[in-house]
Amino acid sequence: MKKYYILDNIIDKTETFKIYNNLISTPSWTLNRLTDDTNDLESSINCFPGMVVEDKGQSYNTYLSGYFQFLTTIIKNEFKKQYNFDLPENILRIHLGAKNHKSETLFHADMEDSRAWTILGFLTPVWKAEYGGNINLEGE
């Protein structure tokens, strides 16, 4: 089985703008998210804005929790259609992170459970190549 799969254009540009504007208007953001918990005080310069929407069954924003639960259903259906494979039903957490070109994300595993899946989405409605940025999955 592959380590990662790619699904493009799950939501259209209009919907992306709607959820993007909703997200940036939500007051639940914190500015101290890190990819790895550490006691190193200097690591705080690598923090980025983040929001916990849902964690271990606890919803912190009912609207966004419902939105991302529904979006996950759409992704799972598209995944089944494209790859003929069922993703697990349970969702352990929905966390959001806002990154920019200076954000440093260290290599990490989202979960220790080898059966767990991560759905990583990009919700930037307008993107230009000069903005930079990339995602590195297992060195690829």
Give short role names for the model-derived ranges:
Residues 65-140:
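Catalytic core of non-heme Fe(II) oxygenases with the double-stranded beta-helix
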Residues 1-87:
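Non-heme Fe(II)/2-oxoglutarate
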